[in-house]
């Protein structure tokens, strides 16, 4: 199902994608196969450790421990967002992305 969703998106091999909340890495696995670079911001420390262990030998991924709402979005290059985000912070995340100095080219929320 995830590969179908990504396949229907406008994400391609030259893209830089930010994934908000990598969780167990199911979406991440698909993104690293397609994208030039993937940034995963994970708030839960145990899931962060899991992602670091799972993707330790992958060169096109950067896993960041922290709160996406405090994460500084890129200012000088284009990027896309692909994420499955919690309902209770959806409005705050969309507001941050919409009003960013350099908003994302595309936003995919599942």
Residue ranges of model-derived segments:
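Catalytic cores of RNA-modifying enzymes
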Residues: 1-110
């Amino acid at each position: 199902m995830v590969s179908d969703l990504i396949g229907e998106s406008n994400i391609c091999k030259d893209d830089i994608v930010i994934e908000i909340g990598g969780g167990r890495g199911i979406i991440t696995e698909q993104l690293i196969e397609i994208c030039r670079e993937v940034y995963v911001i994970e708030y839960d420390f145990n899931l962060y450790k899991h992602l670091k262990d799972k993707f330790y030998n992958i060169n096109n991924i950067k896993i960041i421990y922290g709160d996406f709402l405090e994460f500084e979005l890129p200012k000088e290059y284009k990027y896309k967002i692909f994420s499955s985000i919690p309902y209770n912070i959806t409005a705050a995340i969309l507001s941050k992305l919409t009003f960013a100095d350099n908003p994302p080219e595309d936003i995919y929320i599942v």
